[in-house]
Each structure stands twice: as structure tokens, then as C-alpha cells.
Amino acid sequence: VCATGHTLERSFTNNMLLVSHRGNLFGPEEETENSPAKIAEVINQGFDVEIDVWSIDNKIYIGHDKPTHLITTDFLLRPKLWCHAKNIEALEHLLNIGAHCFWHESDHYTITSNRFIWTYPGKQLTPRSVIVCHTKKETDMVLSTNAYGVCSDYVGYCK
């Protein structure tokens, strides 16, 4: 069992892990995504959440295109978070505190700190893959694969 509480022993097609992209469930909501309140709400509904993490001047923030919301280290250690480091300082901090994290830009695959394979859309899947899907159609299609999970703005439709 890893820090997010997941193991690889599971039923893939009927029990795929659903990871909300930045706290979105039914499509992008730029006004609320990556906000602490939205993330807590989505976790309370039973979803995992991918968040974008920045470190600027030894302070930790979340936000997609820029550091927006100042947060605490305790926030990052919540179960069900997948922390996407947006700069090297954030990656170093996340690794130092033991948060579940990863770094990628345009890679087809990247390994998370808990040994999952963060997978770019349309790439080959494995039982360790968590695939990123950009549309509801992509999200629906991946549900019948052997992927461990799916990260999308549309995972609310999958429950």
C-alpha cells in the first residue's frame, strides 16, 4: 500500500481509480480548479485529485499556470493527492516531505514517487498506468482498459 492508500491488487475494469484533474469533475472550471476548497470537496466525494504545486521563495502554492493559493505542507500530505511539481523547487520539497508526486512536461510516461506510471493520452497502458484524458470521450474509452486509473476533468461522470 502506498501513501495514497492504493495497491496494485484490484479489479481493473470495474474498479478503476478516478483522479480528478485539478478538482474538476464534470469539465474544466477554471475559477475553482486547484483551489484548496475545491480539492477538499472532491476528496470528500471519494475521488483522488491531481494538483499543480509550486515552490516560490520557500513558500508552497497550488495553481496551474502560476502559483495562486498559498498552502501548508500538511495539505500536501493528505491521502488521495497526486502532486504535479511545476518547478524543480516544488519537486525537491515534495520529495523531502514524502508527498506522492511527479514531474513531467511533454513526456509520454513519467514515474510517480509511489511507482505508478503517469501516462500521456494515446500511449500504451500497463496495470500501473494512470492515463491523462483531455475529453469525456477519451475518459469513457479508457474505462475498459487495463490501466490502473484515469485522470480527467470528467471523472464525475464515471461514478
Task: Describe the function of each predicted region.
Residues 2, 7, 12-159:
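Phosphate-group recognition and catalysis centered on beta-loop-alpha active-site segments
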